[in-house]
Amino acid sequence: MGQTKSKIKSKYASYLSFIKILLKRGGVKVSTKNLIKLFQIIEQFCPWFPEQGTLDLKDWKRIGKELKQAGRKGNIIPLTVWNDWAIIKAALEPFQTEEDSVSVSDAPGSCIIDCNENTRKKSQKETEGLHCEYVAEPVMAQSTQNVDYNQLQEVIYPETLKLEGKGPELVGPSESKPRGTSPLPAGQVPVTLQPQKQVKENKTQPPVAYQYWPPAELQYRPPPESQYGYPGMPPAPQGRAPYPQPPTRRLNPTAPPSRQGSKLHEIIDKSRKEGDTEAWQFPVTLEPMPPGEGAQEGEPPTVEARYKSFSIKKLKDMKEGVKQYGPNSPYMRTLLDSIAHGHRLIPYDWEILAKSSLSPSQFLQFKTWWIDGVQEQVRRNRAANPPVNIDADQLLGIGQNWSTISQQALMQNEAIEQVRAICLRAWEKIQDPGSTCPSFNTVRQGSKEPYPDFVARLQDVAQKSIADEKARKVIVELMAYENANPECQSAIKPLKGKVPAGSDVISEYVKACDGIGGAMHKAMLMAQAITGVVLGGQVRTFGRKCYNCGQIGHLKKNCPVLNKQNITIQATTTGREPPDLCPRCKKGKHWASQCRSKFDKNGQPLSGNEQRGQPQAPQQTGAFPIQPFVPQGFQGQQPPLSQVFQGISQLPQYNNCPPPQAAVQQ
């Protein structure tokens, strides 16, 4: 909290001192603590309030309205804030050039009730010197015809006389009077605190116009008059904003304002109230110098480069954008492009933007790619015909000739454009911590992913991995078809290689894939499945088709066209007429080789292609082979048949198994 108070005190130091002097001279004492609290609330809910302060009563009325809105939303606004706000608003009323009045109704009703109760409790004597704790009446609401304006100005604006370096005799036409510590006479006191009825009576009194000269911190500083066509305006010192020096004459706020640059003033005032006091300035501005002696007509004017640093608001926006969205998010790219192309950025500006917005690791990446891009650009400059005289020191802002801001401000437009292109390219290559850049081959469209999202991912990866613009374009167009899902490929296939010259291929692909995945596309797929309608340049059929006629519903062996042609084809190939009756089945006019009947005309089953013989009897086999019995004396000779049968009858008769005794012997 202490740091916030010290920050507010240092930020509005000049304006706080002016307000305290103004209120003290009016007879109202406000502590510095309460003023700091007031400006804390103003900075919280009114970010457009300028640091140098304002003397415009409309601004303070706007502050009151916004504080009321904040109170309605549940924010707590202390009563001391309303008290100080009403006092300052009332004190600034006499300094307005229009008939503006301050109403006590702007303050909360509770403040007025408390003020009236305290007033009734005090005696009349005490009330004359009492300062209300809640609401102050309009400052200088009474008649101030007899007020010594010179003395009032000398007390309120002592710093102005010191800045001018002249005596108070230049303040007004009357003679100067020595300053005293005693207050003004009772009839000349410009501030009175009276009941609420007196406020309404004093509303009808016209405000008094003063001839004043506020301190230098509160002066309205317009752009240089050389922008309005006034020749001979001396240039501002190097390193400072292009503001003219404060005039030494007195200003009369009642005089009609000049119309020179009034539109520009309105734009600047609007930006100032919105909180961007540097909206109309650039880091480096080029202003035409007045023509010198001996200058010829048609000769290009000489320009002077002046540098202006970035505003804190702009750097803060960059830092918050990088932290919240990432350095290469669409928001940050758009913001960076607007800053880069809307300003004349020198290498020092790019380094300030990167250091204030990026983390140390990200800044190291940016610096590395910056140096790499500079080396590549220098090689191109040397290879150009004729060679471009821009070296690496100039593009990096280093070396003896380009290390200072004043030297970089004199860079040529071609060098500024090269620095811009190199730094934007280096910024695009920055990777978030913990993330890696995938290959463009691995970027594929999901089954339910919209085609524009897939193309955006593909372009982002290709932009980070492919440096050559032409090669990047060709690869993106190829991968936009190859890595798309089957549905998008079917829609893109008729357009592949047929996009007219001058048209963007990716845009045509996106148009062709518009609506895929929606209800209409699903209905078309269903109709396609039923009827086989052509969709996306392909005929999609479901089911089996005939390889002879190409129709769906039957196979080639059942094709009616083929069956009708078989007889004619065979007749022409064999050179003979078909028979009258099949010799095999006796019931059809076809050849016997083509007969497929299983029964003849009498119903008898037909064999295959030829007649079969009688079936053979099955052979019986035993466990042991039977050897024929041959009697002795007939080895090598054929024994008589009677003896063979006699030997067979003498063999033991047993079945497939040997007798038990033989099994035991074995």
From Swiss-Prot:
InterPro entries recorded: B_retro_matrix (IPR003322), B_retro_matrix_sf (IPR038124), Gag_p24_C (IPR045345), Primate_lentivir_Gag_pol-like (IPR050195), Retrov_capsid_C (IPR008916), Retrov_capsid_N (IPR008919), Retrovr_matrix (IPR010999), Znf_CCHC (IPR001878)
Stretches for region Disordered: 165-264, 598-642
Coiled-coil residues: none
One BP annotation, GO: viral translational frameshifting
Classification via SUPFAM superfamilies: Retroviral matrix proteins, Retrovirus capsid dimerization domain-like, Retrovirus capsid protein, N-terminal core domain, Retrovirus zinc finger-like domains
Molecular-function GO terms, alphabetical: nucleic acid binding; structural molecule activity; zinc ion binding
Sorted UniProt keywords: Cell membrane, ERV, Lipoprotein, Membrane, Metal-binding, Myristate, Repeat, Transposable element, Zinc, Zinc-finger
Zinc finger region(s), CCHC-type: 544-561, 580-597
Biased composition, class Pro residues, residue ranges: 232-247
PROSITE patterns named in the record: ZF_CCHC (PS50158)
Description of post-translational modifications: Myristoylation is essential for retroviral assembly. Alteration of the glycine residue leads to a block in the budding of particles and an accumulation of Gag inside the cell.
Pfam families (UniProt xref): Gag_p10, Gag_p24, Gag_p24_C, zf-CCHC, zf-CCHC_5
Membrane topology: Lipid-anchor
Bias kind Low complexity: ranges: 624-640
Keyword Cell membrane: yes
Any one of the GO CC terms: plasma membrane
Biased composition (Polar residues): 604-622
Compartments, record wording: Cell membrane
Lipidated sites in chain (N-myristoyl glycine): 2
Main location: membrane
Protein family per UniProt: Belongs to the beta type-B retroviral Gag protein family. HERV class-II K(HML-2) gag subfamily.
Notes concerning its domains: HERV-K Gag polyprotein contains regions homologous to the matrix (MA), capsid (CA) and nucleocapsid (NC) proteins from infectious retroviruses. Evidence suggests that HERV-K(HML-2) Gag polyprotein can be cleaved into mature MA, CA and NC under certain circumstances. However, the exact boundaries as well as the size of processed Gag proteins have not been precisely determined yet.
Protein name: Endogenous retrovirus group K member 6 Gag polyprotein
Taxonomic classification: Eukaryota, Metazoa, Chordata, Craniata, Vertebrata
Gene that encodes the chain: ERVK-6
